[in-house]
Curated annotation (Swiss-Prot):
Subunit (UniProt): Acetyl-CoA carboxylase is a heterohexamer composed of biotin carboxyl carrier protein (AccB), biotin carboxylase (AccC) and two subunits each of ACCase subunit alpha (AccA) and ACCase subunit beta (AccD).
Species of the source: Beijerinckia indica subsp. indica (strain ATCC 9039 / DSM 1715 / NCIMB 8712)
Protein name as catalogued: Acetyl-coenzyme A carboxylase carboxyl transferase subunit beta
Cross-referenced InterPro entries: AcCoA_carboxyl_beta, Acetyl_CoA_COase_Trfase_b_su, ClpP/crotonase-like_dom_sf, COA_CT_N
Keyword Nucleotide-binding (UniProt): yes
Record keyword Nucleotide-binding present: yes
GO biological process, one term: fatty acid biosynthetic process
Gene: accD
Length: 289
């Protein structure tokens, strides 16, 4: 070993080193297919070969949903950040700050208002990347605000659900959001305004036990896991094996819990068609087969 071997290789490695973005290639959890990240983004985060629907953030979802990607963001109310002064391995306030920095959002629900094939609609999107899309005071207030906006604008309300359930760090304050949101669903019904739920992967826990399963029309993305408790918990409780595909969107459709399973690319046309039908508006594009 001499100075040449000590100095030259590091120099060469330094020269050849380049800043390479992580996750250039995304692997399909179902088929193992590798997809270039830009191609996956252009395909709305649906794996081309297998059709597997991966996580999609609220912004690209809304961009693809509304006419020409044009919509108005509806601000969500501020709520007390940490009413219980909760702490586990870290303080709850620190967790919130971490996820706000990670997602660029104040909490797990984003609201927007725009046109679906010319029809007004208020849309809420739950972001599973923000603390598992969990339902706390902020998320509950956001959902309620979206429904209130639909009432004020006399427009259909559409919500894309994705959640692991109630936010444990907020205790009873989190559980209170279940009846509060359910009451607002009833207000939409009394006003004869369409309430359409799009169940995305996963929709579980307290969200599935409240507003997520109360839609006039229940739509689901392919392969989405939908249920209250997890499959393993159910099996351990009843001491029986569950049917294949249990809690998947297609299974729920076959058993009457979901009205239709719709591919992500087809959702704008399908939702516009449903809104037109439920509001007696002029018919637009047909629902894709």
């Amino acid at each position: 070993m001499n100075w040449i071997s000590n100095v030259v290789p590091p120099k060469i490695r330094s020269f050849l080193r380049r800043d390479t973005p992580e996750n250039l290639w995304i692997k399909c959890p179902e088929s193992g297919e590798l997809v270039f990240h830009k191609d996956l983004e252009a395909n709305l985060f649906v794996i081309p070969g297998s059709g597997y629907h991966m996580y999609i953030a609220p912004k690209p979802r809304l961009d693809a949903l509304f006419d020409e990607g044009v919509y108005e963001t509806i601000p969500t109310p501020e709520v007390p950040l940490d009413p219980l002064k909760f702490r586990d391995v870290k303080r709850y306030t620190d967790r919130i700050k971490e996820y706000r920095q990670k997602t660029g959002a104040p909490d797990a629900v984003k609201l927007a208002y725009g046109k679906l094939q010319g029809l007004d609609a208020v849309v809420a999107v739950q972001d599973f990347a923000f603390l598992g899309g969990s339902l706390g005071m902020a998320a509950g207030e956001a959902v309620i605000t979206g429904m209130q906006q639909a009432l004020e604008r006399q427009a259909p309300f559409i919500i894309f659900t994705a959640s692991g359930g109630a936010r444990m760090q907020e205790g009873m304050f989190s559980l209170m959001q279940m009846p509060r949101t359910t009451l607002m669903v009833q207000a939409l019904r009394e006003a004869r305004l369409p309430y359409i739920v799009v169940l995305t992967h996963p929709t579980t826990g307290g969200v599935s036990a409240s507003y997520a399963m109360l839609g006039d029309i229940q739509v689901a993305e392919p392969g989405a896991v939908i249920g209250f408790a997890g499959a393993r918990v159910i099996e351990q409780t009843i001491h029986e094996h569950l049917p294949e595909g249990f809690q998947r969107a297609e299974y729920l459709q076959a058993h009457g819990m979901v009205d239709m399973v719709v591919r992500r690319h087809d959702l704008p046309a399908v939702l516009a068609r449903l809104c037109a039908f439920l509001t007696n508006s002029p018919r637009r594009a047909p629902i894709p087969a």
